[in-house]
């Protein structure tokens, strides 16, 4: 979902997160925030069009158990659409308190963790009023995941991976 300022935030963060990427294409829609379940048909049609147009190596989405209705629907549609792909469900520390123990971790170096924090804080101005949207929250979650995973650097991101093909 990206309309107005949120679309600008998405573009700015994608440019920074994906700097150096060989190719980048952003697809944004302007569905009403908080109403995704009521808009299932057009959203599912967009997912189907994306499936026909893209062949990603990995797909990142919200957790299927996310308590935010929009996030949960997007996760469900991701699994319905990209059945033969590696899907990593990411975490968001927020009001709903729905964090659990991830099943996959990616070690980060301290500079990478700080870069992520900087990009989030610099690019997502619309989220700054939220109590959970702080450098301390982001830093704490990455440190906790670093401890859980035993990452040598002490920093990691956690993901939920429901299906992983090794080899």
Residue ranges and their predicted role:
Residues 41-42, 102-103, 119-121:
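Surface-exposed beta-strand edges and their flanking turn/coil or helix-capping segments
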Residues 106-143:
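A conserved mid-domain beta-alpha-beta active-site/ligand-binding segment of alpha/beta enzyme cores
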Residues 1-86, 94, 100, 144-154, ...:
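Active-site beta-strand->loop->alpha-helix modules in alpha/beta enzyme cores, enriched
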Residues 77, 134-138, 156:
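Residue-level signal for alpha-helical context at structural boundaries
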Residues 159-160:
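Short, solvent-exposed loop/turn segments enriched in Ser/Thr/Gly
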Residues 96-110:
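Phosphate-binding/catalytic loops
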